[in-house]
Curated annotation (Swiss-Prot):
One of its GO terms (cellular component) is early endosome. The lineage of its organism: Eukaryota, Metazoa, Chordata, Craniata, Vertebrata. The modification Phosphoserine is found at residues 14, 23, 306, 310, 342, 344, 617, 948, 1018, 1050, 1091, 1108, 1153, 1157, 1159, 1190. This is FK506-binding protein 15. Residues 340-356 have a biased composition (Polar residues). The modification Phosphothreonine is found at residues 1093, 1198. Residues 929-940, 1202-1216 have a biased composition (Acidic residues).
Length: 1216
């Protein structure tokens, strides 16, 4: 309008309105190096659900024989497999897909299998192996038989892991990686990125270590936002940048870069410290900004696969010509036809470019202005306006409607101007000031303020429904919102998504047409607004001049209005013609486009038919060639296997031949050496034969001697068994005699107590008589004279002498009785000791003979070994009966040691002893069965069964003298060397400290016996002169308790207390305790504790008194009960010995009237067979009635023996 036709022509004929025809058919792909896509192989589409039934009955071919190396499973998952048969995919079922690999031989392959014994197909993975990733978790590949397989994974995670493992296997299949290796993990659609495009990616980088993904050296998972980069900027390492080329939005890819492509500075992303490492990146493209789209829109990042067209630029950028270069992609066969699209576009363009509609729009807009210039139009215009608006609304919904061309009459009825012009405010703005070219050039107004405001306020239409001119209510001169002229239909939006170059071309063409028409409409609207401002100015000027020339101004206004209206009408007609011409051009171009599309489809169908024919012929040819190749390969494999077997046999035979040659040379050398040795050995053999004849003679002589000695030895053994039986009988007699002696001692002690009681009664009566006589004497002295006093003194002296004589007679008779009993017991003991000494001498002689026999036997064994002609086996006599006999004897002897009527638990002791005897017999029998073939072992086994024949060790020579008053009384003790292994181990019998009735003289401490643990009670007696001493201690006085001992007055001469012993077995074998119970003293007021303290250096027996050598008494709190625990078999304390010791002590006190203990030959002979073994005592607290004295400065009691190991060894010494 107003001479702006050149601008319209240039706008419509600008380069943005045209496009290359070559881009329609993708002929410019040669410039990108892809070649003609129609003659390239395109992979078939993924199978649909109904395609697997067609080839369900066909059997899958047997896979090529896979190498059975030491391949390991790198990854395995379940897939749905499809095989490409006869132009479509046939479902084969659900298989297992595994990636197998052998890192040493660099052999990797994909295995599809039904089970472990049923492989389906094998595809070897090498550098040129291609695993093509498809949408919906599909992947396709060719196996070793060139069969196309498609597998569908159950999840995207499984597909990504499988594809990743295949890529790593491709990298591991070559020795050195020289180029970047890529593998798509997830398929994506859309244009590929190129150099210069901006990306937003998420990545994770690993080091390839030991053929697997190793340490993660970089990842965006640890960062707040993903990485943004521009390809070609050098922000990342070269290998990663090369691997990103060709990716699409939403795609994932695994990129393996060699060390040569991972070089860069330290700040570059993906750079690592080790320079020789292979880097592995997993990259996901999230957002893309293409460099070719940066000029057409102002957004930072645009998505090319979105359905909405690009927004419209602002008014100041209308003059720029956006050059859009669509990415040429091949038109795949099977795409829907585009004829309907082009028709709908052309119809929309023709309908929307109708000049009637444009004129109706303009008139409606002018009518809606604040001050309308034209007269009121008939009501027909409103209906046209509503019709056009309804039509545009329907077109926005995708319907193409043709509105009728309505030409309303624009002739003005009368030029009446409203009076509202003065009220229109001036629009404020800083727009461009352009003078009007049609009216007055001298007047310059701010006319473009409204236009620029409209242009600036213009916003991109939301979706595809409306191009909106947002209005501001405060500005009255602003244009009203207009319906969109050419909205893109919603139904066509899905066809613009990834449908190739034709779709992109049509989209850009439609956009260009829309922008050009919009620009033309905007220009017309701008010119109308400019005209309106001019008219307003003229109205202002005319209102000022109307005061002078009212008629003239009216005529001037009407003439000017008419001229302007005529110009407007002319311009509208011219614009109508231009629009008609352009719409005709667009229709012609649309017809051409549709013809070209139809022609293109025909060519594509023809090419597809030709390709199918070629494919069929190629498939038949390839099947034939594959059959031949398979046959040839099978033959080749057979031949190669035979050749390998033959070469292996040849090499094996050559190795055998060389080995045989070496053996031959070695054997020849050995033969020469052996010949020399045989010469030497022949001479040696002759000498040995002579020696052998001599040895045979000697062996015959020794055999005769051995037989005679064996017979004599058997006789001696019979004698020994008889002697042992006698010895056991003697021991039983000894025990019975000792019991009798103890009973007699008890009786004598009781008689003595009775005698003492009688003496006390006599003394009391005597004292009463004396008192009575003294009283009489006093009376007589008073009453009588000196003669009577003399008679009385004489009578008193006679009575006293008679009383003393009676007392002496009674004491002498009691002493005589005790001495007679004691002498009888000593005589019996001496007789038993003599018998035992004789038996010991005989046993020693027998042992010497046995030792001589064993030496002779060993000598004979050495002679037989030198001859190497020992007899094959001698029937060794079965010693089980002898062992049973010996063990029965042992048991009888043990049972004789105990009496079930006594207070100790005899049943428990018998059970433990029987258990030990059984264990010993089993050990002996097993030991004898292992070596029953050799007769020497029989002798060695019988030897430990006679421990009673061993010679006892020397004992202490005598009893030390009794210590003075206040010192500890030491008891003799047999040293550990004297303890001889006994025939049977006896358990420990715990006995408390006897509560003795103390005999107390004036100023002397009481003494009592101390029980000691006696070992080897069943042992043969010791030789004469080596006594085994009893342990004696000072007795402690106790208060009279029923049934306790009787205690006498302190002024009496002698006191005797009977031993009250309680046997308390505290457990089984090895867990018994000796408890010593302290007794409370009446006279001294405290209790004494007796402890055993050995002196191994001097050979003295241990002291049994808690007092120190200085004569000081130990405090009562230290006199506590001792628990003596034993770890091995223990001996019982004999009650008879304790009783006899008590009796002996009392007799010795009666005779000597002083402190002494049993010592000398009598006591030694009485207890010669008993050996004392007291283990380490452990202190046990006991309540005391008296005041406690501090034990500071006194050493603790020491154990009887220094070590218990010797005792344990002695206990089991009878086993050998």
């Amino acid at each position: 309008m107003f001479g702006a036709g050149d601008e319209d022509d240039t706008d419509f004929l600008s380069p943005s309105g045209g496009a290359k025809l070559a881009s329609l058919f993708g002929l410019d792909q040669a410039t990108m190096g892809h070649g003609n896509e129609f003659f390239q192989y395109t992979a078939p589409k993924q199978p649909k659900k109904g395609q697997g039934t067609a080839a369900g009955n066909q059997t899958a071919p047997k896979p090529a024989p896979a190498t059975t190396g030491t391949s390991s499973v790198l990854f395995a998952t379940a897939v749905h497999a499809y095989r490409y048969i006869n132009g479509q995919y046939a479902k084969q079922g659900k298989f297992g897909a595994a990636v197998l690999g052998n890192h040493t031989s660099r052999e990797y392959r994909i295995l599809l299998y039904i089970s472990q014994q049923q492989p389906v197909t094998v595809a070897t993975i090498h550098l040129n192996f291609e695993l093509m990733v498809r949408p919906n978790n599909y992947s396709t590949f060719y196996d070793d038989q060139r069969q196309n397989w498609s597998i569908m994974f159950e999840s995207e995670k499984a597909a990504v892991s499988f594809n990743k493992q295949v890529c790593v296997a491709k990298c591991n299949s070559i020795s050195s990686l020289d180029a970047v290796l890529c593998q798509d993990l997830v398929a994506a659609e859309g244009p590929a990125v190129e150099t210069g495009d901006s990306l937003e990616v998420a990545y994770t980088g690993w080091l390839l270590q030991n053929h697997v993904l190793g340490q993660v050296f970089d990842s965006t998972a640890n960062k707040d936002k993903p990485l943004r980069l521009k390809l070609g900027s050098g922000k990342v390492v070269k290998g990663l940048e090369d691997g990103l080329l060709g990716m699409k939005k939403g795609g994932k890819r695994l990129i393996i870069t060699p060390s040569a492509c991972a070089a860069g500075s330290e700040g570059v992303i993906g750079w690592t410290q080790p320079t020789d490492s292979i880097l592995v990146f997993e990259v996901e493209v999230r957002r893309v900004k293409f460099a070719r789209d940066s000029g057409s829109d102002g957004h930072s990042v645009s998505s090319r696969d979105s359905a909405a067209p690009s927004p419209i630029p602002a008014s100041d950028s209308l003059s720029a010509d956006p050059v859009v270069t669509p990415l040429p992609l091949p038109l795949k066969p099977g795409e829907p036809g585009l004829r309907s699209k082009s028709n709908s576009l052309s119809e929309q363009l023709t309908v929307n470019s109708n000049p009637d509609t444009v004129k109706a729009k303009l008139i409606s807009r002018m009518a809606k202005m604040g001050q309308p210039m034209l007269p009121i139009l008939p009501p027909q215009l409103d209906s046209n306006d509503s019709e056009t608006e309804d039509a545009t609304v329907l077109r926005g919904a995708g319907q193409s409607l043709v509105t009728p061309s309505i030409q309303p009459s624009l002739q003005p009825a009368h030029p009446v101007l409203p009076q509202m012009a003065s009220q229109a405010p001036q629009p404020s703005g800083s727009g461009l000031q352009t003078p009007s070219a049609a009216l007055m050039q001298a007047v310059s107004l701010d006319s473009h303020s409204a236009v620029s405001g409209n242009a600036q306020n213009f916003q991109p239409y939301a979706g595809v429904q409306a191009y909106a001119y947002p209005q501001t209510p405060s500005v009255t001169s602003q244009l009203q919102p207009v319906r969109p002229l050419y909205p893109a239909p919603l139904s066509q939006a899905p066809h613009f998504q990834g449908s190739g170059d034709m779709m992109s071309f049509l989209m850009t063409e439609a956009r260009q047409h829309n922008t050009e028409i919009r620009m033309a409409v905007n220009k017309v609207a701008d010119k109308m607004d400019h005209l309106m401002t001019k008219v307003e100015e003229l109205q202002k000027h005319s209102s000022g001049n109307s005061m002078l020339l009212p008629s003239m101004s009216v005529t001037m206004e009407t003439s000017m209005i008419m001229s302007n209206i005529q110009r407007i009408i002319q311009e509208n007609e011219r614009l109508k013609q231009e629009l008609l011409e352009k719409s005709s051009r667009i229709e012609e171009q649309n017809d051409k486009i549709s013809d070209l599309i139809e022609r293109n489809q025909r060519y594509v169908e023809q090419s597809n038919l030709m390709m199918e024919k070629r494919n069929n012929s190629l498939q038949t040819a390839t099947e034939n060639t594959q059959a031949r190749i398979l046959h040839a390969e099978q033959e080749k494999a057979k031949v190669t296997e035979e050749l390998a077997a033959a070469t292996a046999q040849v090499s094996h035979l050559q190795l055998k031949m060389t080995a045989h040659q070496k053996k031959e040379t070695e054997l020849q050398l050995q033969l020469t050496d052996n010949l020399k040795e045989t010469d030497l050995l022949r001479g040696h053999v002759t000498r040995l034969q002579a020696d052998l004849s001599e040895l045979r003679e000697a062996s015959e002589q020794t055999q005769t001697k051995f037989k005679s000695e064996k017979q004599s030895r058997r006789q001696l053994e019979l004698k020994v068994t008889s002697l042992e039986e006698e010895l056991t009988d003697l021991r039983a007699e000894k025990t019975s005699l000792e019991k009798n002696l103890s009973e007699r001692k008890k009786k004598s002690a009781q008689e003595r107590c009775q005698a003492e009681a009688e003496m006390d009664e006599i003394r009391k009566s005597h004292q009463e008589e004396l008192d009575r006589l003294r009283q009489l004497l006093k009376k007589a002295r008073v009453s009588t004279d000196q003669a009577a006093a003399e008679q009385l003194t004489l009578a008193q002296a006679e009575l006293q002498s008679q009383w003393e004589a009676k007392c002496e007679q009674l004491l002498a008779s009691a002493r005589d009785e005790h001495l007679q009993q004691y002498r009888e017991v000593c005589a019996q003991r001496d007789a038993h000791q003599q018998k035992l000494a004789l038996l010991q001498d005989e046993c020693l002689a027998l042992q010497a003979q046995i030792a001589a026999f064993t030496e002779q036997k060993e000598h004979m064994q050495r002679l037989e070994k030198t001859k190497s002609q020992a007899p094959a086996g001698r029937a060794a006599a079965d010693p089980s009966e002898k062992v049973k006999k010996i063990m029965n004897q042992v048991f009888q002897s043990l049972r004789g040691e105990f009496e079930l009527e006594e207070s100790y638990d005899g049943g428990t002791i018998l059970r433990t002893i029987m258990h030990t005897i059984k264990m010993v017999t089993l050990q002996l029998l097993n030991h004898q069965e292992e070596e029953e073939e050799e007769e020497e072992e029989e002798e060695e086994e019988k030897k430990p069964l006679r421990p009673s024949l061993e010679q006892p060790g020397p004992a202490t020579p005598g009893m030390p003298p009794a210590p003075p008053s206040g010192e500890t009384q030491e008891a003799p003790e047999v040293l550990p060397e004297q303890v001889v292994g006994e025939t049977t181990p006896l358990p420990l019998q715990a006995l408390p400290t006897p509560e003795n009735g103390a005999q107390t003289r004036k100023g002397e401490p009481a003494e009592a016996e101390v029980p000691s643990e006696i070992k080897d009670s069943s042992l043969p007696p010791q030789p004469a002169g080596i006594p085994a001493h009893r342990v004696l201690g000072p007795p402690t006085s106790i208060p009279p308790k029923p049934p306790g001992p009787v205690t006498m007055d302190s002024e009496s001469e002698e006191m005797l207390a009977a031993d009250q012993r309680t046997v308390q077995p505290n457990g089984l074998l090895g867990e018994e305790h000796v408890r010593e119970v302290a007794t409370d003293g009446l006279l001294q007021g405290n209790s004494r504790r007796l402890s055993l303290t050995p002196d191994p250096e001097k050979g003295e027996p241990p002291a049994l008194d808690p007092e120190s050598q200085g004569g000081e008494a130990q405090p009562p709190e230290c006199k506590q009960a001792e628990d003596v625990s034993s770890s091995g078999p223990r001996e019982t304390l004999l009650d008879t010995e304790l009783a006899s010791a008590a009796a002996g002590t009392s007799l010795r006190h009666n005779q000597d009237s002083q402190h002494c203990s049993l010592s000398g030959d009598e006591e030694d002979e009485l207890f010669k067979g008993a050996t004392l073994k007291v283990p380490r005592p452990t202190a046990q607290p006991e309540e005391e009635d008296e005041d406690e004295v501090s034990m500071k400065g006194r050493p603790p009691p020491t154990p009887l023996f220094g070590d218990d190991d010797d005792d344990d060894d002695d206990d089991i010494g009878w086993l050998g």
